[in-house]
Amino acid sequence: APAKEPIPLSQKIAFGVGMLANQMFPAVLGIFMVILVEGLGMSPLLWSLIFFIPKLIDAITDPLMGYISDHTVSRWGKRRPYVFIGAIISGLSFVMMWQLDPNNSIMHNFYYFLAWSCIFWIGMTIFSVPYVAMGYEMSSDFHERTRLMAVAQWIGQWAWVLAPWLWILLYDPNWFESAAEGARFLSLWVGGICMVLALVPAIFCHSNSGAVGEGVHQDNSSLADTLRDFGRGIVITLSNKPFQKICIATFFIFNAFQTIAAFSWFIIVYYMNGGDTAQAGAWPTLFGSVMSLCTCFLVIPVVNGMAQRY
């Protein structure tokens, strides 16, 4: 049974380091994505497809990854191997995704980026689904799990504090001749560092999924049996009323957040400053960074305190 004693602070920090990678990838991706329109001349339609298609695949692979992880039996447990593999795939594919050349045609860059983006989000699925499940298995105590997630979210939120400062590097001619060149170079650092951070929970965190795994291992099950079992699990999960409420809340919160995050740069630069990036200055950076600092020092402590009390 999962341990009821408090999770050691070192384990909470190790888990939180993984959350930093889990948040840093999309935080930097949201900043770099502007380059596809600004620096490489992609149309809004192509830009929308680059957002839509990988996330559509992500929506399909997420529950599938959960099923695979739950049914895995290994000496390393049923979460850590996938966290390890997903971290490597995500880091390497993030680097490859941004090796774009403005001299290539727009459609060449579109298909190149789309292909690597799909691989990246599959890697993120392999990493993030077992990673989050690992966190909930580190303790059976509700309040201890809440404290773990508060620590992890606090550490992870710093991704949104730090990432906006890449705006300044990307558009400073003293650093890079163009934003596209800046993305090619900075992706090496972001992908490499985030890959290392994502490997930390796979190596140092100890969930209670069992040393040899506690997945339901069915040697003689056919593909049809497996698909039926998977479908039955989806139906049972979706019929759960509390889960439905969580899904609805998550849908609206994430859509609101992602919409603002994706369009904030365009609003600040084009609506408020007439398309002049020099005039916009550090405002795109400050907008994202200050909001995230408020989340770190106001929202997360308050929500964690309320969860402990109520």
What annotation goes with each model-predicted range?
Residues 1-310:
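Membrane-embedded alpha-helical bundles of multi-pass transporters/translocases
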